[in-house]
Amino acid sequence: MGRRVAVFSTAALALLIAGGAWMSAHRFHPGYEVGEENERENGRPPVEGDYWAVRLAYGGDPQHLRFEPTWMLESARQDRAIAEAVPTGRRSYVRSAETALALDPDAFTLLGPMPLRGEGFGADSAAGRTNVIVSDPDDPAIAYLGSDGGGVWKTTNCCSAATTWTVKTDFPEIASMAIGDLTVDPQNHNVLYAGTGDLRYGSFSFGAAGILKSMDKGETWSVLGQDVFNPLYGPSTNGFPQYQSIGKVVVDPNDSDNVIVGTKTGVFFSYDAGGTWDGPCFTNAFSTSTTAQRQDMTGLLAVNRSGSTVLYAAVGTRGLPTPVQPDLANNGANGVYRANMPSSGCPAVADWTLLTNGFPAGTGSGAPNTSRGRLEIAVAPTNPLILYAMFTDVTTRGILGIYKTLDGGDTWASIGAPGSPGSQMWYDAGITVSPTDPNVFFVSTVDLFRSTNGGTSYTNMTDAYSGGPVHPDNHARAFVGGDPQKLLNGNDGGIYFVDNAISATGSGNANWIPLNDTLPTIEVYHGDITANFATAATSGVNAGFQDNGSATAVFNGTPAATSWNATNGGDGIVSRIEPVLGQRWYYSSQNGNLTVSTNGPNNPEASASGAWSGDVLSFVFPFDIYRYGALDVAGSGCTSAQGCTHLIAGSNRVWETTTGGVSGSGWAAKTGNVTKNNLILGGDNRSFINNIHYSVSDPTVAILATNDGNVQYVFGLGAAGAATAVNVTGSNAVLPNRPMLDATTDPLNPLIGYAAVGGFAQNTPSRPGHVFQVTCSAQCASFSWLDKTGNLPDIPANAIIANPNIPKQVFVGMDWGLYYTDDISVPTPVWQRFEGLPHVMVWSFTIDRGFTTLAAFTRSRGVWAWPLPVSQGGGADLAVTITPPDRVTPGLEMHYSITVTNNGSDAAVNVQLASPTPAGLTFGSNTGDCTTAFPCVLGTLAAGETRNVTTSACVSRTYTLPAPVPLTASVDSDTTDPVPGNNSASASAPLVLSVFADGFDCL
C-alpha cells in the first residue's frame, strides 16, 4: 500500500492550446549568439577543452591521464557478448487505460529536431554538422553524407526541398557513428568507403572505429580494420591520450583493390580492398625524431596520370596546442608530399618527395612553427597536373595562403585568398575544383567562397552572419551529376544545395535550398519533456544543442519526429520545463548562463542565473527542477498556483532556489565546495559538479556527481539557510576514483543512490566498474557501496536513471548506446543493450511528471522517447482521471466527473477516493458510485473494473480567484499499486464571469 504519491496535472500545458502564437515571437537577428558562438576558435570548449581526455583517462592523478587503445578493443568484445535483447517491458508492455496515444512500446520514438527552425540564419532549417558529402556518379538523385556523430545517411531523391534522408549505418557492429570521410570507388560506383572518427581537432571529437565498406550503394555496410584504426591512441610522454580518426579515404583510380587512408597518425595502405592494412606509414622522417612531429593527414589524393597513380599527402597538424592535444604545436612536418602508388607495404620515406617550390620557407623542415597549420589540397578533375593547396595560419587561425600548381606539384604559386574567412580555419576548411573548369573552385571557411578566375578574386556565396541563406562553418562540398552549377554544401547546420553555383553573383541570388527536413543529426546535451508526455493530448519537449543553441517542440497528439523552434543561441546545454502549469521553460548556454521564458516555449525573456560565475564550474553546467511534488502539500515544492518552484544547480558547490529562479531571484549557495578540488590541469581547475538531481520522492534530498570522483548527498534543501552535504565517496574504497558523470536516487527510497562512472577500469584496476549503488542510513550517517556493473562494457557511463514504475529497472546511457537491467537488486545484474535506439552516445535522460515516458538525449542523433513499462508482477494499478466542466460561472452550480479504473491484474481492496473542494466553493453532493461526501469508500475494484463519480459544488457569486478553477482527485487502496504515478490527477475549468440580478447563489 503506497500512500505517498505525486499529483500530476492534466492541465500542465494549458498554454499549449495557444499553439503557433508561441512560435511567431522573437525572431533572431543573425550573429554569433544565434545558434552558436565562434565556437571552437580557442580549442577549449566543451568544458574548456579537456573534458574528452578527463572523462576517459582520469584515474585519480591529473598529471598522469592514461589510455591504451587495447582497452577499447576489449570493451568492444564485452559489448558484443551482451545479448541483443530488449527490456522485459518492451515485449509485454501493459499500456494503462489512460494511454490514449501511441508511443511505440517496442522502440524509442524519434522526436527530432527534424529540422531546427528559427535559429536566425536565412534558410531557417538546420541539422547537425555534416563532415563530408558524396554525389553518386551514376545517378544525381543519389547522395550520401557523413555526420560528425550520427553515421552515414543516403538520399535517393536529391536535390530539392522534398529531399529525404535515411540513415544506413545503424547496426550493432559499429561502435562509433562519427564519420570523417566518404568516397566512391572510381571504377565501381557500387562500392563506398567511410572513415570513422572526426579529424577536426574539436575538443569533443569522437575517435575512430574502423573503415566502413558498402558494396551496394550504401544500403548495407561492413566494418574493416577495427583492430588497426583504434578509437584513441596513447599520449606522448606526460601528455594526454589523444583520439585517432580517419580524415581521408581514397581509392586508387587504376586499381580498386588499393585503398589509402589518412589518419591523425599517418597513412595506411590496403592492397586487398580493405581486408588487411599496412601502417602507419610516414611521408617524412620526423615521426621518430628527437622531438617527434605529428603526422595528421588533412589532405590525401590518388590522381590518375595516364594509367599511373600518383599520391599526394598533406600533413596539416593544427599547430596550436589544446588541453586535449598538447603536442599540436609539433607541426614541423606540415607540407605536401608526393609519391607513386606502391605495389605493397608502406612506401619508404625516401619514396616521398616534399614539394616546397613556392611554398613558405621552412615548409616540411621538421621545425615547429607558428604559421603553417592545417593543410587542404584538391586536384582539378579536368587536368591532373593542376592542384590547389591551402595553408591555415596558426597564429591568426585564418588563411595563411592558397597555392596553385600547373605541373603536378613541382612548382607552386601563391594566389589570392578570400578576404574574410573567419578565425577558425583549423576547423572550417576545404577546397573543391569544378568538374569542368580548373580555374573555378570553392573554398570552405566560416562562409563558402567561390573563385571563377583561378584565385584572383572571390565571391562570398553564403554570408551567414550578414543575413545570408546558409548556416556558418562550412566543411564539405560535392558537385551533383558533374554539373558545375549544382553544388551540395555541408556545414555545422547540415546540408544545403544550390543550382546556380557559377552564375549567381553572390549569396543574394544564389538559389540555396536546405535539405535538412529529415536529418536529425544535431548534437544534444540535456533536455526535458512535459508532464504525462505519453498520455496528454498536447505535450512538449526542449533541449540544448552544441553549436545550435536551445529549442522547443510541441506535439498535438502522439509525439513524433518534427521540426523544433530555436529559442536562444550560444552552445545550448541544459533545458528544463516546469511541469504543472507549463509556463516556465528554462534554457542554458555554456558556463552556466541560465534563462527562462515565463509564457511557455517561447524565447527566454529573463535571466535565471545565480551568482555562480566566480565559481569553478563546468562548460556543461548542470541544473534541475523538482517536478514530482504533490500539489499544495506543504514542502512538496509544487502548488497549483505557482507550479513547481524548486531548482538546483551545481558549480563546485550546490545552489538552490525555491522561487523558480525567475530573474535570478532566490538562488543561494547551499553548500561549500563538494569536490576534492584536486583535478588541476596546468593552471585550470577541473574539479566541478558534472550532474546534480533531486531525489524523485523527496525535494529536500539531492545527489550529485563530481568530475574528480566524488558522490555527495545533500540534505535539508527547500528551506532557508545552508543545506548539509554528506560525502559518500568513502575515500574511493569501493567507488572508483574516476570521473563521476551522473548520479540518481531510487524512485521510492532516496537513501538508495546510483552512480554512473566514466573512464576505464584499467586506470583503477583494484576498483573497476561503471555502475554503483549506495545505501545510506538516515542522513547518510553510514553508507555502503555495491558494484552493479555486471556485464556492462568497460566504456564511460554518462547517464543513469531508474524506472519509477519498476524501481528495479535501471537504464544507463553509455558512449555506445542505452543499456538496461530489469533487476538492479541482484548481486550481479544482467545488462542488455536496448536495440530500439541507435548505437550512439546517450548523454542524458529524463522521466516526466506522471512517469509515462523516458526521454533520451543523444549526440548527433537527436531526442528520443519511450513509454515506460509498468510492473509485470501483479498488483492493483489504480488510475484516476478528472473531466472538468466546460466553464465555471459565479453564482451557479458546477459539476465535474471522476473516473477510477483498476488497470492492474489484481483486485484493489478498500479503495478510497478523495477530491477536496476548491477554496471559494461549497461542496454540494456526489452521485454515481459514491453518494456520500469525500472521502468516498468505493470498496473493492476487480481487475479492469471502473467507478464513476459526479461531484457538484456551488460557486459563490463573488468568486474570482483562483482562475481557472483547480480540481484535484486522488485514489488509494490497501493493495500494492505498482504504478503510483497515476493515483492522482488534476484539471482546471475556465472561469466565465456573469452578472446575476437575483443576488442569490446556486438557485
Residue ranges and their predicted role:
Residues 1-11:
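N-terminal Sec-pathway targeting helices
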Residues 19-28:
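Bacterial Sec-dependent signal peptides at the C-terminal "C-region" and cleavage site
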Residues 2, 369-372, 881:
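Short intrinsically disordered, low-complexity coil segments enriched in acidic
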Residues 10-20:
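Hydrophobic membrane-insertion alpha-helices, especially the h-region
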Residues 27-870:
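Beta-propeller blade termini and top-face loops
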Residues 12-13, 52, 483, 537, ...:
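Exposed boundary/loop context
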Residues 872-1002:
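Exported/extracytosolic protein signature
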Residues 8-9, 23, 95, 213, ...:
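Intrinsically disordered, low-complexity segments enriched in Ser/Pro/Gly/Ala and basic residues
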